[in-house]
Amino acid sequence: MEFLGELIYDAEGLVLGRLASIVARNLKRGYRVKIVNAEKAIITGDPNMVKKEWLQKVKRGDYYKGPFYPKRPDNILKRVIRGMLPRKTARGRELLKNVKVYIGVPEELKDKPKLGLNLENAKGYPEALIKEVLKAKPKFERGNIKYIELGELSKYLGAKFT
């Protein structure tokens, strides 16, 4: 597969599922994707319900047989992206190898432009990609929105990360 380039997303303040669908679409187009600040992505909904649902997923199954659900925010985000790819095919497995998810911003990516809510950091990216990532923005204009950050959810599930 020919690669079109590398995209770097800043997940801060973006809705988890919308970001994952955009990333999956760009992986299928042929981009390599890196996501920073995974712990700052949000899941909309009542925080207590979200915690309850994810705890039920993590506790489900058997220690030996699974299903195995991640607790760390970077692994949760990668698992959500995996669910939007055809992971049981060779192509899907190859696509998943082209995703890197980070907690925080690593040193090598600090100075590079990133796609996210802060448009000043997106210099150098095509206008279409910038508009696409803005679709992952939460709809705050309808009033107060209930949400939980992925880092907070992970700590509730028992993850230890910095």
Curated annotation (Swiss-Prot):
Please give the function described in this protein's UniProt entry.
This protein is one of the early assembly proteins of the 50S ribosomal subunit, although it is not seen to bind rRNA by itself. It is important during the early stages of 50S assembly.
Q: Which gene encodes it?
A: rpl13
Q: Which GO terms describe its cellular component?
A: cytosolic large ribosomal subunit
| Entry-linked NCBIfam families | L13_A_E, PRK06394.1
Cross-referenced Pfam families, in alphabetical order? Answer: Ribosomal_L13
Q: Does the keyword Iron-sulfur apply?
A: no
InterPro entries xrefs: Ribosomal_uL13 (IPR005822), Ribosomal_uL13_CS (IPR023563), Ribosomal_uL13_euk/arc (IPR005755), Ribosomal_uL13_sf (IPR036899)
GO BP term, example: negative regulation of translation
Tell me one GO molecular function of this protein.
mRNA binding
Keyword match Ribosomal protein: yes
Instruction: Indicate the quaternary assembly.
Output: Part of the 50S ribosomal subunit.
Question: What PANTHER family does the record tag this protein with?
Answer: LARGE RIBOSOMAL SUBUNIT PROTEIN UL13, RIBOSOMAL PROTEIN L13
Family, as annotated: Belongs to the universal ribosomal protein uL13 family.
Question: What Gene3D superfamilies does the database record attribute to this sequence?
Answer: Ribosomal protein L13
Q: Which domain of life is it from?
A: Archaea
Name the chain's protein: Large ribosomal subunit protein uL13
Q: Which UniProt keywords apply?
A: Ribonucleoprotein, Ribosomal protein
